[in-house]
Regions:
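Signature of multi-pass transmembrane helix bundles
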Residues: 1-54, 163-294, 311-313, 385-409
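Hydrophobic alpha-helical segments, principally membrane-spanning helices and signal/leader peptides
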Residues: 36-39, 46, 95-97, 132-140, ...
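Generic signal for short, ordered secondary-structure residues
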Residues: 101, 105, 140, 231-234, ...
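Membrane-embedded alpha-helical segments and adjacent helix-loop junctions characteristic
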Residues: 29-128, 257-346
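C-terminal transmembrane helix pair
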Residues: 114-115, 122-161, 167-197, 323-409
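Short glycine/serine/threonine-biased micro-segments
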Residues: 12, 59, 68, 108, ...
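Generic hydrophobic alpha-helical membrane-segment signal
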Residues: 2, 91, 98-100, 135-140, ...
Length: 409
């Protein structure tokens, strides 16, 4: 329901602003730009879905091999104590826990191409447990919030952009991103847990969160001992070694059980195209709405309004120049990336705004895109509290990013 209101608001607000521009300022370009954005956004949505087809086909095939070989079930048993607490509505030992783990792991390593197909597989498995096929279940929402909060341990792509833009130390945003994304994820889990009345103060969850904190601290310490080139090399190498190990491990596990690995892969891969096609209408809907909102100038007005309010309250407005990235990130990953690059081009890669825009880019994820793709793949229309929890996690990430960047830079 929330997504429905937001979608309507994108169009209505954009239309009203365009009317005002035409009436009061004689701007005859607003409506053509909005209409052009509908065509370009529709094309982009289809191209994204088309681009996902090959990757979906590959990873759905790999997942089927893992299922046949028992590797996914083994992961499920290993993670049962944690997932029983975090996803109480999922039966203990269900294969979906393995898919969830692999999706979260791929996201943490910055492997988006692997994470999305694994996430869609997890959604399909959770849908089999859903009695109301058009309504999101509690596990679906918790899983989606884990994705939208954008927990990332190795932000390789952002460091590459900083290097290309001439940053003296492209890796100097690594620790701030790690801390900001940790706060956004923790907030997402807590808020969703409150909505779903999940007891997070139990021994298993406290030990798990403590272990994650220790892992984050160890990674921060390890990478802080490296120079920028070593850091980029090691992070990329580790991420891809782990990913390739998963693929080979699944294949060997299936071969050990005398499974016809090739046939199992083909069986799973057949679902790739149909899944990509199911996503198209949902993706077109959200990207077109975002495109119209941005083309109308509403986004620029929102940012200028925030800057005026902060200045009126006597606050420091240094961070406002990076807000376009923060505001765009829940709406469009490519749009936020463009805002980040624009901020580094305008203010400099090593400026406060340039660095903060990079931390914004890494601290949250594309909430509405994820909702459109993940829920769209299984035909979910009623999202319940998914949007609220996802946006609160995003807000926590933005606030944490601002505070941390003031501390670091």
């Amino acid at each position: 329901m929330v997504l429905n209101y937001i979608w309507i608001a994108f169009f209505v607000v954009a239309f009203v602003i365009a009317i005002c521009k035409l009436e009061f300022w004689g701007d005859v370009e607003a409506f053509p730009e909005m209409m052009n954005s509908t065509f370009s956004s529709s094309k982009t949505a289809f191209e994204i879905s088309l681009g996902l087809t090959g990757v979906l086909t590959l990873w759905l095939g790999i997942m089927r091999v893992g299922e046949k070989g028992g590797a996914v079930n083994a992961l499920s048993r290993l993670l049962s104590p944690v997932f029983v607490k975090l996803f109480p509505d999922i039966p203990k030992g269900h294969p979906v826990t393995g898919s969830i783990f692999m999706n979260v792991a791929a996201n943490m390593l910055g492997l988006d191409n692997a994470a999305t197909p694994l996430g869609l597989k997890a959604m399909e498995q959770m849908q089999t447990l859903n009695n109301k096929k058009d309504t999101a279940t509690n596990p679906m929402i918790m899983f989606l919030v884990l994705n939208t909060s954008g927990l990332t341990l190795i932000p390789v792509s952002i460091m590459v952009y900083r290097a290309q833009m001439g940053a003296a130390q492209p890796t100097d945003i690594f620790v701030p991103i790690l801390l900001a994304t940790f706060f956004s994820t923790l907030t997402g889990i807590i808020v969703t847990g409150i909505y779903q009345r999940i007891n997070l103060l139990n021994r298993v969850m406290l030990l798990t969160l403590g272990g994650i904190c220790a892992l984050v601290a160890a990674i921060i310490w390890g990478f802080s001992q490296m120079d920028k080139e070593s850091m980029n090399t090691v992070s990329t190498l580790v991420a891809n070694i782990l990913l390739m190990t998963i693929i080979v491990g699944f294949i060997l596990a299936a071969a050990r059980k005398r499974v016809n690995v090739y046939d199992a892969f083909i069986e799973g891969a057949k679902d790739g195209f149909s899944t990509a096609v199911r996503i198209i209408p949902y993706l077109v809907a959200i990207l077109v709405a975002i495109g119209v909102f941005r083309a109308s100038g509403a986004m620029d007005m929102l940012i200028d309004g925030v800057k005026y309010m902060v200045a009126a309250l006597g606050g420091d407005t240094d961070f406002v120049g990076a807000l376009p990235t923060a505001l765009m990130k829940p709406l469009s990953g490519s749009g936020a990336r463009g805002m980040m690059v624009d901020a580094m081009t305008t203010y400099g890669a090593d400026s406060f705004i340039g660095r903060l825009s990079c931390v914004f880019q890494g601290s949250t994820d594309t909430t509405f895109y994820i909702i459109a793709v993940y829920f769209g793949s299984v035909g979910i229309r009623h999202t319940r509290h998914a949007v609220t929890c996802g946006l609160l996690a995003d807000l926590a990430g933005v606030i944490a990013a601002i505070a941390i960047c003031y501390l670091f830079f």
